[in-house]
């Protein structure tokens, strides 16, 4: 594999020599940093099992190597990447997998390491959504996830990835993470803080990642990380689990941030060792039980992961100074709720008691029940999924609801051929040889929902959202 030129500041190299355990080779570290990163994917088990996915893609000639810390994660090699980018494959468009760096699968693996079943989880720095979608899959789309993102421009990307993966149990917020300890004290069973960092571990993906690096900036970033971790720890309920992670390599942003929390709340913090997270984890283990992953150890990005438990309650932080404002939704109950549910079920949209119906003017939404106790405490950018818009003749069902809720074996399901599915993704109407009998059609491909559509004569009218329409080659094996 070809090497690429990585920019290394002298002070960074000095710092790494001091930080690296004697069991690791510094020369191997430099060599690993200059190798391009191996591509990796995570199968979305909300949509398909690992076994079924492997059977589905077997004819494609993709080479998949299991990632040891994530059962549904694989390093991938493909011969047709130039002709068909991985993100343009039908399987990616329908949410069957997420393109995710192998190291970044570690934090969620750690969060669920003891096979715990948290009902309310926060992902404090969530965009672009790889870890939020991984958490949702581990939760089976049940309970609730508060996915927060400080960057306004990245919230839209976060929502797009959540929607593509068929996730229904998520609320999105747009805050500085430092507000949550005060705003939502001891409200979460589990929290992931994948903290903003200096990014020293990502040079294999971005050779210029260290262009603006300095020891002073590391210290400034670590100060922010301590404040974020303090906030996250206050938002965690006693007995809850918190995972702190970064994609950087220095001790100041990693071990020392966690040790600061332990020193500050000595009677409340318990470090949970990660030595048995996966076979060979001990190669990256620190004396504290954290994982400090240098890139040469597992041939991946550099990463740091710490797992801890809150063993006692903490005094509350000062109340936040902001006003949440009036919540514009009202619960939908009784006859109205029954009418919506029956109409949705008739076209193949199904949900359980984990989701509750709410209404805003003509909009009908489904909110995760576990998030309802947070209403009035924070302002949401988006909550749950938009199910429908009501109109004189019934309901206009929304695309994100179809992707998350549709039953592909429903009586109105209509399976497209590969050629027809490609036309669908291009935004074109479908003219099947044998049109469906029903007027309302649940369009599927590979037994996955692509959308709800209307049959007009012998034509299926395309309803794929314009902003998602693709062109060019989309399907492996098609000419």
Curated annotation (Swiss-Prot):
Q: Which residues form the active site?
A: 247 (nucleophile)
Q: Which HAMAP family match?
A: 16SrRNA_methyltr_F
PROSITE patterns in the cross-refs = NOL1_NOP2_SUN (PS01153), SAM_MT_RSMB_NOP (PS51686)
**Cited Pfam families:** Methyltr_RsmB-F, Methyltr_RsmF_N, Methyltranf_PUA, YebU_pre-PUA_dom
Keywords, comma-separated and alphabetical = Cytoplasm, Methyltransferase, RNA-binding, rRNA processing, S-adenosyl-L-methionine, Transferase
Which GO terms of the cellular component aspect does the record hold? cytoplasm
Recorded superkingdom: Bacteria
- The encoding gene is rsmF
In which organism is this protein found? Answer: Salmonella agona (strain SL483)
Q: What name appears for this protein in its UniProt entry?
A: Ribosomal RNA small subunit methyltransferase F
Q: In the Enzyme Commission scheme, what number(s) does this protein have?
A: 2.1.1.178
**Which GO biological-process labels does this protein carry?**
rRNA base methylation
User: Where does this protein chiefly localize?
Assistant: cytoplasm
Location of this chain's protein in the cell: Cytoplasm
CDD domains, sorted: AdoMet_MTases (cd02440)
List, in alphabetical order, the Gene Ontology terms for molecular function in this entry: RNA binding; rRNA (cytosine-C5-)-methyltransferase activity
Described purpose of this protein according to its UniProt entry: Specifically methylates the cytosine at position 1407 (m5C1407) of 16S rRNA.
- Class in the EC hierarchy, top level: transferase
Q: Which reaction does it catalyse?
A: cytidine(1407) in 16S rRNA + S-adenosyl-L-methionine = 5-methylcytidine(1407) in 16S rRNA + S-adenosyl-L-homocysteine + H(+)
Q: Which family does it belong to?
A: Belongs to the class I-like SAM-binding methyltransferase superfamily. RsmB/NOP family.
Binding residues annotated for S-adenosyl-L-methionine, in chain numbering? 125-131, 149, 176, 194
